Amino acid sequence: MNYEFEREIGFINSQPSLAECLTSFPPVADTFQSSSIKTSTLSHSTLIPPPFEQTIPSLNPGSHPRHGAGVGGRPKSSPAGSRGSPVPAGALQPPEYPWMKEKKAAKKTALPPAAASTGPACLGHKESLEIADGSGGGSRRLRTAYTNTQLLELEKEFHFNKYLCRPRRVEIAALLDLTERQVKVWFQNRRMKHKRQTQCKENQNSEGKFKNLEDSDKVEEDEEEKSLFEQALSVSGALLEREGYTFQQNALSQQQAPNGHNGDSQTFPVSPLTSNEKNLKHFQHQSPTVPNCLSTMGQNCGAGLNNDSPEAIEVPSLQDFNVFSTDSCLQLSDALSPSLPGSLDSPVDISADSFDFFTDTLTTIDLQHLNY
């Protein structure tokens, strides 16, 4: 700082000191010589910045007016200053080399923001950019931005015609300020979009129909299961009723005598149980000989009616035969045989008096079952 301050003060003084001249001139000459050598060897290939002394006017001795006035006896200072002061014009503008040239990819990346900022109105400029990019080869085209009016007209035309003929395509391109290629590409893309939309709708409809079919199948299966269950219940109920009815008929048939004379079956109408039938049922559980007794009584009764005997026709009042009860019949049957057979083919011999007695007594019991 003191050195520079003294030099600035020396600008006012007309006579500089000897030490100041000795310290300032030799390095300046060396720098000028080195700069001239470098410029000659490189042959203006690169731009070399000026020396540090030239950037600061206070440190440049050639531009200082006091050097010309004070140090006039030294001729070396002026030629050195004259050699270093002029700068050639070629050094300021270096030549371009292949590695210094900008690539087209960098230009393409820089162009889309500018194109987007201009808006969709500059269609002619965009077309020129697309042509320039297409000539480069291997690079991707810029996407065309259509205006609302262009899209509206294109959609209208697509609604009526999915495919365009050449004259119509040229007409639409001229009407909408587009190229024929742009119109063709837009229609291709629109057809693909329409195809995707229709396929999605068909898939959704098929899925909905399939779901409806599955639901209807499930409902039908449930209804079939319910109907089968109801049928099984009704069949089981009918079987139970039938079994109960057959059981009741079997019980009643066991109480009656179904066998007739000479193997002919004789059926009796079903009537409600009377007091005598109840007594017979009671004795049926007590002794196994009651059905045999009843069968013999039915056979004797049938024989008496078929022979038209006066004993069978002349029926006395039932009050006269109250003496003969079922107990007496059972006692008589037990007295005659411990195991009385139920058929006429029995090998046991019974006397005629006993048959007459049975016919007289049993006809009165069987007459109670007849409906007059």
From Swiss-Prot:
Keyword Isomerase set for record: no
UniProt entry tagged with the keyword Acetylation: no
Region annotation Disordered: where it falls in the sequence: 48-95, 194-225
InterPro entries: HD (IPR001356), HD_metazoa (IPR020479), Homeobox_Antennapedia_CS (IPR001827), Homeobox_CS (IPR017970), Homeodomain-like_sf (IPR009057)
GO cellular component entries: nucleoplasm; nucleus
PANTHER family: HOMEOBOX PROTEIN HOX-A2, PROTEIN ZERKNUELLT 1-RELATED
Function: Sequence-specific transcription factor which is part of a developmental regulatory system that provides cells with specific positional identities on the anterior-posterior axis.
Protein name: Homeobox protein Hox-A2
Native organism: Mus musculus
Upper classification of the organism: Eukaryota, Metazoa, Chordata, Craniata, Vertebrata
